[in-house]
């Protein structure tokens, strides 16, 4: 944990405006929607004096087994979304906030909330430094953490910060990005970032569909490549939650109704809870990793090629062409 003042996050505000002006936001909302608000703790809690920041690890001590090939096409989920990693952090922060309120101060907990740029307050509080992949890296631990804050009218002594840079000349995360989304150290072009592409509504640009590979939600490549996160992250592992979904049966998902998807993957961010976007992603995954000879694959693709939703029909047609291309390398797609 760390503590910082409730002053405006000037550098973060400038970065949000600059990147939005350059179109690097990729049309996302979140903290980009209103930078003046998301970079000013006083807009979240009037008369705030301090921000308490906490980081909770989500790297597991044991990784789930990769599904066997005969299990059918499975889609990969980013680590932070295997379960709702923010729920236990939110509970802990609210408990601390409650204790602060008992001393007649205002205190509000925020986690996975657009009210404040958590990464920026964590940086100023000295929890870590910005990696070239734009993640916050904690000294001796890496980036496998989710962040949350308490904004309060109580005044606490700030912890020393920011932490000194620990990346040096390393560019492994930049080299590892499958779409070249890290356009400069610490600068992400969200238009190319697979994590955002898989959340963004609309048709997935053709040039990124093959690069998506077997991913349905999230992408960990820039973190998996980070030597600090890989080497030191295991010091801060948690037990694997029995509810963890690291892999999704793509055909099962495509056959399922919305309420089933919502019940199982409701902690995912899905625009307007329109699960067509999750199905769209699953179709791309099947095109990339499905067995062209599997009758279950052929059935679900043909079903979606005739779908009333033009987005799903178009992605199913692409998947069919991709399966044909993989089955007969060199064939026209």
Language-model-derived ranges and their functions:
Residues 172-195, 215-239, 300:
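Iron-sulfur cluster-binding cysteine motifs and their immediate structural context
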Residues 278, 297, 310-313:
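Positions within the helices of HEAT/ARM-like alpha-solenoid repeats
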Residues 279-292, 314-326:
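Structural detector for internal amphipathic alpha-helices that build alpha-solenoid repeat scaffolds
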Residues 243-276, 283:
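Alpha-helical adaptor scaffolds
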Residues 1-6, 47, 310-315, 319-333:
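Long C-terminal interaction/binding lobes of large macromolecular proteins
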Residues 260-264, 293-305, 325-333:
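Amphipathic alpha-helical scaffolding segments comprising HEAT/armadillo-like alpha-solenoid repeats
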Residues 199, 269-274, 303-312, 333:
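Short coil turns that connect the paired helices of HEAT/ARM alpha-solenoid repeats
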Residues 1-166:
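Auxiliary alpha/beta "docking" domains used to position bulky ligands
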């Amino acid at each position: 944990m760390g503590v910082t003042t409730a002053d405006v996050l000037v550098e973060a505000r400038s970065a949000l405006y600059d990147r939005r002006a350059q179109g690097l936001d990729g049309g996302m909302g979140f903290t980009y929607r209103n930078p003046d608000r998301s970079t000013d703790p006083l807009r979240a809690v009037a008369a705030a004096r301090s921000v308490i920041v906490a980081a909770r690890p989500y790297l597991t001590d044991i990784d789930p087994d990769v599904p066997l090939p005969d299990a059918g096409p499975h889609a990969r989920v980013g680590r932070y979304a295997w379960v709702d990693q923010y729920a236990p952090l939110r509970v802990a922060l609210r408990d601390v906030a409650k204790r602060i309120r008992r001393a007649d101060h205002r205190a509000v907990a925020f986690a996975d909330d657009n009210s404040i740029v958590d990464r920026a307050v964590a940086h100023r509080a000295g929890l870590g430094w910005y990696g070239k992949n734009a993640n916050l890296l904690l000294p001796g631990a890496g980036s496998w953490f989710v962040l949350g804050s308490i904004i309060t009218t109580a005044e606490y002594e700030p912890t020393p910060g920011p932490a000194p840079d620990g990346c040096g000349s390393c560019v492994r995360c930049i080299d590892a990005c499958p779409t070249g989304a890290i356009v400069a150290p610490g600068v992400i072009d969200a238009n190319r970032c697979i994590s955002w592409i898989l959340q963004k509504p609309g048709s997935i640009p053709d040039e990124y569909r093959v690069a998506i590979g077997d991913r349905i939600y999230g992408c960990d490549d820039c973190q998996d490549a980070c030597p600090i996160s890989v080497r030191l992250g295991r010091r801060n592992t948690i037990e694997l939650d029995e509810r963890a979904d690291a892999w999704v049966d793509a055909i099962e998902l495509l056959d399922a109704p919305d309420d089933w998807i919502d019940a199982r993957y409701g902690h995912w961010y899905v625009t307007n809870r329109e699960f067509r976007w999750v199905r769209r992603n699953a179709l791309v995954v099947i095109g990339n990793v499905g067995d062209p000879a599997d009758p279950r694959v052929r059935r679900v693709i043909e079903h979606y090629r005739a779908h009333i939703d033009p987005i799903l029909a178009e992605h199913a047609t692409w998947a069919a062409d991709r399966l044909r291309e993989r089955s007969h390398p060199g064939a026209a797609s």
